[in-house]
């Protein structure tokens, strides 16, 4: 409950209907998954799928209103591994996952814990979906002590959850949760080296990098 201050420093005994709420939340989740694996000579293939359903029930005892949301979540995954001669391996993986909004993000509340920065929930938020791709290569020559590796990972998000901000002439910022496209993250890594037995020394180098893009509205 939120109460407004009076001119004499006391607080009004009547709740501020814009900022007040009394919520009861119930969350129910059920999950299931399956996978298929196939091995043939130097190849290993795996395909799987998981699914879950999450149900939200939000009852505002202050306004005597009830909101319900149901999210169906899918978790596809696949991998391909090819083992070459010696200790060389090539691995390609994909996984997908939905992510439902949190209670704070979908509840239609106006939060005034910080009077200059007001956060508003969005009951119409969609769940986001992440596509995760990765490619890895590893090689090690036991006799010569030479090793090398490289990899890249890329995550792309559909209907990502972000914020839309607006600022009033008085300097108050209002932030509302919204869905956006165009969010992604990518990183890469690699290295190589060898062991010099007669010097009891290992020489090598490594490199890595990353790029991240996250959209919001102002």
Question: What does each of the following model-derived ranges do?
Answer:
Residues 1-218:
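Exposed, low-structure sequence patches enriched in small/polar residues
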């Amino acid at each position: 409950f939120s109460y407004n201050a009076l001119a004499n420093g006391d607080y009004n005994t009547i709740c501020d209907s814009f900022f007040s709420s009394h919520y009861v939340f119930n969350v129910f989740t059920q999950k299931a998954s399956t996978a298929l694996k196939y091995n043939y000579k130097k190849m290993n293939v795996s395909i799987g799928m998981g699914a879950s359903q999450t149900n939200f029930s939000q009852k505002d005892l202050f306004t005597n209103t009830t909101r319900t949301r149901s999210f169906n979540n899918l978790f596809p995954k696949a991998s391909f591994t090819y083992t070459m001669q010696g200790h060389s391996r090539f691995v390609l993986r994909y996984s997908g996952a939905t992510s439902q909004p949190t209670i704070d993000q979908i509840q239609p509340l106006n939060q005034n814990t910080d009077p200059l920065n007001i956060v508003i929930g969005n009951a119409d938020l969609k769940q986001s979906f992440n596509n995760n791709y990765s490619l890895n290569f590893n090689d090690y020559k036991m006799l010569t002590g030479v090793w090398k590796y490289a990899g890249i990972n890329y995550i792309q998000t559909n209907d990502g959850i972000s914020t839309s901000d607006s600022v009033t002439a008085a300097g108050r910022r209002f932030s509302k949760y919204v869905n956006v496209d165009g969010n992604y993250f990518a990183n890469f890594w690699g290295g190589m080296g060898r062991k010099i037995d007669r010097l009891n020394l290992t020489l090598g180098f490594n490199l890595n990098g990353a790029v991240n893009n996250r959209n919001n509205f102002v």
